[in-house]
C-alpha cells in the first residue's frame, strides 16, 4: 500500500513525532510512506530523515510564521501537491492546512484521511468556512482531543467519518541519563505560548527551595524564557538542555513532571511521564484533563502559577498519586498499537473503493 502522508508543518514537535513513529511502524503492515510537508524547518527535515522518511517540502525556513500551513489554506500548496499524489493509494493529511490542500489535489478515486492533533486556535485568522468545504472530500477524520472532535462534528464530519485519534509515545521503559541530580523537576515540549513554559518558570519562583528543573525542548519562546528565568533569579535552578530525541531519559526518575499547557488535546509528554511512573502535574484543559483524570495525575487550573506552585510543593513533599493506574493507561499508546488502528482504517477505505458512489470528488 502506498500512502502519501502530508504534514502542514514539519518541525520537532509532538504531532510530527507521532506521525513519524506511525509511518515507521506501518512498514510492518506493508505500508510504504511518502512524506510531504507544507512548511518545514531544517531541524524538522533532519528529524524525518532520522526515521528513514526523507521529506519533500513546499517551503523551508528556520522559523515558522503564525500563518504557517498548519493553519492556513493555500491554493499554491494544493497545486504543488497535485503531481506528488498521483501514485498514492491513499492520502493521510495532518493539520487543516494540509488536508484542505489535499482535498483540492487528491485524485477522485483516492481515499483522503485527515487528522487534527490540536485545539483549533487559529493564530492567524479563522478558516472554519474553508475547512467545512474541504471536509466534504474527507473520507475519514481522526480527532485527537475533545475540543477538536466537537469542532469537526460542527463542520459536518460526525456522520460516520469521525474517529478518535490514536497517538503514541516512545521511550517506555527508559533509564535516566547519567549525572542528572535527584530530586529534579522536568518539562518536555516546544517553547511556545500554548505549552506555557513561562507559567512553569513563574511557578518555580513561588516554590520554596525549588529543585533543579530541566526544561527539555526548544522553540520561538526560548529567548523570552531565558530572560524570564534571569528576571526571577532562577539561573541556578532552570536548565535548558535543548531539543532531545530521548526526553524519556530526562523524565525517568524525576521527582515530578510538569505539563503546564494553556491548550493540550493530547500530551505525549504527560503520557510518557505516567508510563515511567513519574508523578505528573498538568493543567485541566481539553484532553489533558482526561489523560490525568481518574487519579492518574494532579490537575491544576491553567495560567495559575500559584496553584501550580502549590501542587508542585505538595508532590515534592511526598503527596504523590499511585503510579500504577498511570502505567496501565500509558501502555495502550505504543507505536505498534497506533499502527494497527490506522492500518485497519486504511484497509477499510481501500476495500470500499469499488462500492457504488464511494469517494466522489466531494460530498453534497
Q: Language model features by range: what are they?
A:
Residues 113-139:
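A conserved, positively charged/aromatic
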Residues 136-161:
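A short, active-site helix/loop in glycosyltransferases that binds the activated sugar's phosphate group
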Residues 243, 262:
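Aromatic "clamp/platform" in nucleotide-sugar-dependent glycosyltransferases that forms part
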Residues 279-282:
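Short hydrophobic beta-strand element within catalytic cores of glycosyltransferases
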Residues 294-305, 314-319:
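Conserved acidic donor-binding segment of nucleotide-sugar-dependent glycosyltransferases
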